[in-house]
Amino acid sequence: MKHKVGILGGTFDPPHLAHLRMAEEAKKQLGLEKILFLPNKIPPHKHISGMASSDERVEMLQLMIEGIDSFEIDTRELMRAGKSYTYDTMRDMISEQPDTDFYFIIGGDMVEYLPKWYHIDDLVKMVTFVGVNRPSYQTEVPYDIVKINMPETTISSTEIRNNIENASTFLPEKVWSYIKEHQLYGKK
């Protein structure tokens, strides 16, 4: 019998409670053995002064999942030189773990963008995409996507960074403490 592993990719700048809830709900609803958090590089065109470094984002992820044995972090995309595509990452993971079925978890904003993903027609044959509802995004695309139910949330990392003074309720306590201690996103 194959293993069932979920993958939640993102910039996680910062990781917040909606990320944690997405992972928990996907694991529970799909019977996944574990969830891999896959932080990616912040594309050069997205780099804005005040964003956290790769190391800081990984440290915040570690704080968020601390004590949850079935949650792990995979940093391969941060280590890759040049562009990093999900297709390449999944090809590598499948080669390393041929006895595993991978479930790639994405929010509604990414479901809408899915047709534009690099090698998407091949990628949908390699993994099962899992879509999580998100307000104001369409979730109908020409690909098979397993949808999971989760209370809709409007939490986003961008909104948290832009309103960091009022963000504590959207963040795990240890992540909030880390942000304050390291004065990230303008938090003094």
Swiss-Prot record:
Pathway terms, separated by semicolons: Cofactor biosynthesis; NAD(+) biosynthesis; deamido-NAD(+) from nicotinate D-ribonucleotide: step 1/1
Pfam families associated with the record: CTP_transf_like (PF01467)
EC id: 2.7.7.18
Catalytic activity: nicotinate beta-D-ribonucleotide + ATP + H(+) = deamido-NAD(+) + diphosphate
GO molecular function: ATP binding; nicotinate-nucleotide adenylyltransferase activity
Biological process annotations from GO: NAD biosynthetic process
SUPFAM superfamilies: Nucleotidylyl transferase
Gene3D superfamilies reported in the protein's UniProt record: HUPs (3.40.50.620)
Keywords recorded for this protein, A-Z: ATP-binding, NAD, Nucleotide-binding, Nucleotidyltransferase, Pyridine nucleotide biosynthesis, Transferase
Function per UniProt: Catalyzes the reversible adenylation of nicotinate mononucleotide (NaMN) to nicotinic acid adenine dinucleotide (NaAD).
Family: Belongs to the NadD family.
NCBIfam families, per the entry: cyt_tran_rel (TIGR00125), nicotinate (nicotinamide) nucleotide adenylyltransferase (TIGR00482), PRK00071.1-3 (NF000840), PRK00071.1-4 (NF000841)
Protein name: Probable nicotinate-nucleotide adenylyltransferase
Organism: Listeria monocytogenes serotype 4b (strain CLIP80459)
Lineage of the organism: Bacteria, Bacillati, Bacillota, Bacilli, Bacillales
Gene name as annotated: nadD
